[in-house]
Amino acid sequence: MTLSSEDREAWLARWREGRTHFHLDQVHPTLMRYIDQTPLGGRILVPLCGKSLDLGWLNDQGYEVVGVELSEQAVSELFEQLEVEPIRTRDGPFEIWQSPGLSVYVGDIFELTANSVGTFDTIWDRAALIALNPTDRARYAPHVSSFLKKDSTVLLSVLVLSLIHI
């Protein structure tokens, strides 16, 4: 099951219209704080990566980084920020943008399979879980977990909200 056409279009529209307030202009502090909990040089999956500076930073730290992002615009902006000219290939429904140690799959995270990308030592989920439509969250966790090696690590940044009833 893939993302609905409405969810796809809403996400792509956010990027087209510049409604990306969630994007940080720095490496995420939580990632920097906890990266030492992961195997150095391991493979890291970054779902719904956008144009996050985390990908370049992780690559610079010696990790093999694989991102997944629906918006080609976001991926293009990422590689522009990194000042890297990617090699672009196609694998099934995905266009893959690659540079040494970094690959970004442009397409629907729910169409990604371990057969195409392999398995990972770590998943860094900065905001993918909260970016998804609530109806997709229940299937997201088991889906991305299927990419994990045994004894792997998930770094998950979440928001804690207090609900006040009036």
Regions found by a protein language model. Give the residues of each.
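A short glycine-rich, Lys/Arg-flanked "PGG" loop and its adjoining helix->strand segment in the class I
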Residues: A138-K150
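A short acidic, Gly/Pro-enriched loop at the edge of an enzyme's catalytic core
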Residues: N115-I123
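S-adenosyl-L-methionine
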Residues: M1-L40, L82-L112
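Conserved small/polar residues in nucleotide/adenosyl-binding loops
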Residues: H165-I166
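Conserved class I S-adenosyl-L-methionine
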Residues: G41-G50
